[in-house]
Regions:
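Hydrophobic transmembrane alpha-helical segments in integral membrane proteins
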Residues: 1, 14-24, 201-205
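Short, hydrophobic transmembrane alpha-helix segments
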Residues: 9-19, 36-44
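Perimembrane loop-to-helix junctions flanking transmembrane segments
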Residues: 79-86, 228-245
Length: 355
């Protein structure tokens, strides 16, 4: 429904037809109301997040349309919006955010809507979305505050702040949901008895976390304009995008250093000491945040909307892609391990002991 609505609204605005635009708006609201009533007339979901995510899914498709029109794949759907919207939407970072929201977030919203409809738990996928949303929101707000577009904040920025406020409320709703894990006592005891040498996968993750922490801190220092020759050479050869005046990449590296850095230390502790029940939730939030951040960073570093002097040089692209893709994927595997084999991180409850 988002596609025809975007096309009609864009056409009405360009034709300066106020009556037609008003009619289209009323018709859209009526169609959405009737559709929602028809779909949930038998049993309306009691969870208010059902309606929040339904609206978000609608706007995710709009964001996908924005990304496609920016790449000239389609035309005439959101032309007026691209001219009047906040300037950040036309940056490489905003461009990649549109694709992320239109693809990944759209899928996540559909999964959570389906889980609510069927009465299933959506806490895990919800925590992944929480991490992705928080990273996007923090970089957006701080990037607008310190970047070159800080003086171009318009009414749509206030609308975006409303979206962030509702999403923060949704985050608290997700965190308040109980965990659905049910692990046998024997499995927990068996996992706790294994030493690190008998957990080769965890050993590999620990070996990864140490250089990942160093890489995270190093890029944060680069974003802070460290005068070290290593930092200067790295910026010039591999990631000149960190110097982009929009400030989004610089803010993203600083956020990663301040939050991902401590996470890697905490994750090391969680993999070494049994009974850290918070480990699966923490990896879900972090993997969602890192996936969103790295997708935006990698895409914007190579995108044609980034000025040529700030793009990754052609001869450095293989190394850049290898390092950043590994830095993105390994935390996803760690999250998978913690969520689907959580016995090592669980504590036996008194009820399980009595059984």
């Amino acid at each position: 429904m988002s596609i025809p609505i975007c096309y009609l609204f864009n056409s009405f605005i360009y034709n300066n037809s106020a009556e037609a635009f008003f009619f289209a708006g009323c018709t859209t609201v009526l169609i959405l109301a009737l559709s929602a009533r028809f779909m949930i007339k038998k049993k309306a979901p009691a969870d208010p997040l059902f309606y929040v995510y339904a609206v978000y899914a609608f706007f995710s498709v709009v964001n996908l349309i924005i990304g496609l029109e920016q790449d000239n794949i389609i035309d005439g759907f959101v032309t007026f919006y691209l001219k009047e919207a906040d300037p950040h939407i036309n940056t490489a970072h905003g461009h990649m955010i549109s694709y992320w929201d239109g693809c990944v977030h759209y899928l996540v919203y559909l999964l959570m809507i389906a889980a609510i409809t069927w009465g299933d738990s959506y806490r895990a996928i919800g925590l992944y979305w929480v991490g992705s949303f928080l990273m996007r929101a923090i970089v957006y707000i701080l990037g607008n505050a310190v970047g070159k577009y800080g003086t171009h904040v318009g009414p749509l920025f206030l609308l975006h702040m409303l979206y962030i406020s509702v999403s923060v409320w949704a985050c608290f709703r997700i965190f308040s949901q109980p965990s659905a894990q049910d692990i046998q006592l024997t499995s927990i005891q068996e996992a706790e008895r294994k030493s690190l040498l008998h957990r080769p996968l965890d050993l590999l993750f620990i070996i990864y976390l140490i250089p990942a922490l160093a890489f995270c801190v190093f890029r944060g220092l680069v974003a802070l304009d460290c005068s070290s020759k290593w930092c200067q050479d790295y910026t010039q050869r591999y990631e000149p995008y960190l110097k982009d005046p929009s400030a989004y990449p610089k803010v993203q590296m600083l956020v990663s250093m301040l939050y991902s850095g401590p996470y890697y230390i905490i994750a090391l502790y969680g993999l070494l000491v049994p009974g850290c029940e918070w480990m699966p939730d923490l990896t879900l939030v972090h993997s969602g945040a890192l996936a969103q951040a790295q997708f935006s960073h990698i895409g914007a570093s190579l995108h044609t909307r980034t000025p040529f002097s700030y793009r990754v040089p052609a001869d450095s692209q293989p190394v850049f892609l290898l390092v950043n893709v590994l830095y993105t994927l390994v935390p996803q595997f760690l999250c998978y391990r913690c969520c689907f084999r959580p016995a090592f991180f669980c504590r036996p409850t008194p009820e399980k002991k009595s059984e």
